[in-house]
Amino acid sequence: MASPRELTQNPLKKIWMPYSNGRPALHACQRGVCMTNCPTLIVMVGLPARGKTYISKKLTRYLNWIGVPTREFNVGQYRRDVVKTYKSFEFFLPDNEEGLKIRKQCALAALRDVRRFLSEEGGHVAVFDATNTTRERRATIFNFGEQNGYKTFFVESICVDPEVIAANIVQVKLGSPDYVNRDSDEATEDFMRRIECYENSYESLDEDLDRDLSYIKIMDVGQSYVVNRVADHIQSRIVYYLMNIHVTPRSIYLCRHGESELNLKGRIGGDPGLSPRGREFAKSLAQFISDQNIKDLKVWTSQMKRTIQTAEALGVPYEQWKVLNEIDAGVCEEMTYEEIQDNYPLEFALRDQDKYRYRYPKGESYEDLVQRLEPVIMELERQENVLVICHQAVMRCLLAYFLDKAAEQLPYLKCPLHTVLKLTPVAYGCKVESIFLNVAAVNTHRDRPQNVDISRPPEEALVTVPAHQ
């Protein structure tokens, strides 16, 4: 029996790790959040214009945001790469042998890429986005998963509401490269005929015939659900997420608290009150919200003084969330960047090297913050119009989710004081409007300096620090 290895504390994340031959021992989940002992293959099921790609993209964005390496594989895009010019629905007719051959080759090419991603590139979840409307096709994909050691989870989207289908068709026409520069009525007619090509052979997931499979069936964009044999934690997270999203038109407003007394002094964290300009911003925010005339707006704040003072000026009910509190800077709370460089130069350099994963001594990392904020994302997905008054690091995390930003980009997203970001979900993404409320404030954004080496001189460490009192 091997003797226990020595432990050492990782300087970046502040977690204890075993050492082997003088080097830290790596483990399978070094780069991501490990929630399952084997990769997961998510297989979309459903007729065209049922929201499969919408679900695929949202699910991929969510899983990547919480730290699970995920990639979407859209078979339609593989087909467009092979067949450069789409002509008509006849390509999808069941008796079109050439079309069938090309579609099968594209599906196999996508599965090869799935295998590469999950088995060679360290991926945890692959989303296979295609119609997969026959039991035979789904069995082929399931067998592929079994042969490669993947857990397979099916997500079927069923729509019988004509209004939902019509709205989906409009979105597909707007977003699909197949119908660029095509007459609208002609495109609609062709797409309806394309759907008919699948309808006769469509076999929905069946509670008896498919009782051994793991799946969720989503009816009419979340009116009801059927869930069967959830196999592990990651599948339960997927089900929970899919049961929270909706497509009702709405806007989410994100802003930071008004300028604080510590912002003026260039100090991070703490629980200060608003500066005079911060109080002026709170009044301007109240006027802005009133002018917007937003139906049933909900207002959320953190439990920190500066966000609550900002919300008080609105004169409306608001809800305080502890999870919306600013990132905990640990031993560096209420310090300036200059003081951190003087007292903890190693920590300052390590944070610049990997700002997303770096954890303050006795504090948090952005990675920790994302995990803390997941309940907020779930509730934002459930809600309609919401104003979130929060903090710089928190706002960056929320913004990264809605804009699908990578972990490396997240800590450097610009979220200036006294500016409201209006996020409006659209077909496969999010429209962003930035509204500055004309109240001056200090700049608190610090870019990554060019020199992030531990031995750098102080002036190179501090070159990107914004001006302050």
From Swiss-Prot:
Q: Which PROSITE patterns match?
A: PG_MUTASE
Question: What does the entry list as the binding residues for beta-D-fructose 6-phosphate?
Answer: R79, R103, T131, R137, K173, R194, Y198
Please state how the activity of this protein is regulated.
The most important regulatory mechanism of these opposing activities is by phosphorylation and dephosphorylation of the enzyme.
Q: Where is this site: Transition state stabilizer?
A: H391
Region 6-phosphofructo-2-kinase: start and end of each range? 1-249
What result is annotated for mutating N181K?
A: In a breast cancer sample; somatic mutation
Q: Can you tell me which residues form the catalytic site? A: D129, C159, H257, E326
Binding of beta-D-fructose 2,6-bisphosphate occurs at: R256, N263, G269, R306, Y337, R351, K355, Y366, Q392, R396
SUPFAM superfamilies named in the record: P-loop containing nucleoside triphosphate hydrolases, Phosphoglycerate mutase-like
Q: Which InterPro entries does the annotation name?
A: 6Pfruct_kin, 6Phosfructo_kin, His_Pase_superF_clade-1, His_PPase_superfam, P-loop_NTPase, PG/BPGM_mutase_AS
GO molecular function ontology, one term from the record = 6-phosphofructo-2-kinase activity
Specify which residues bind ATP according to the UniProt entry for this protein: 46-54, 168-173, 348-351, 392-396, 428
Question: Cellular component terms, GO, for this chain's entry?
Answer: cytosol
Task: List, alphabetically, the CDD domains matched.
Answer: HP_PGM_like (cd07067)
Q: Which reaction does it catalyse?
A: beta-D-fructose 2,6-bisphosphate + H2O = beta-D-fructose 6-phosphate + phosphate; beta-D-fructose 6-phosphate + ATP = beta-D-fructose 2,6-bisphosphate + ADP + H(+)
EC numbers: 2.7.1.105, 3.1.3.46
Q: Which UniProt keywords apply?
A: ATP-binding, Hydrolase, Kinase, Multifunctional enzyme, Nucleotide-binding, Phosphoprotein, Transferase
Q: Where is this region: Fructose-2,6-bisphosphatase?
A: 250-469
Pfam families per the UniProt record, alphabetical: 6PF2K, His_Phos_1
Question: Do you know which PANTHER family this protein is assigned to?
Answer: 6-PHOSPHOFRUCTO-2-KINASE/FRUCTOSE-2,6-BISPHOSPHATASE, 6-PHOSPHOFRUCTO-2-KINASE_FRUCTOSE-2,6-BISPHOSPHATASE 4
Q: Which family does it belong to?
A: In the C-terminal section; belongs to the phosphoglycerate mutase family.
How would you summarize the oligomeric state and partners of this protein? Homodimer.
Q: What does this protein do?
A: Synthesis and degradation of fructose 2,6-bisphosphate.
Q: Report what the protein is called.
A: 6-phosphofructo-2-kinase/fructose-2,6-bisphosphatase 4
Organism (species) = Homo sapiens
Identify the coding gene.
Answer: PFKFB4
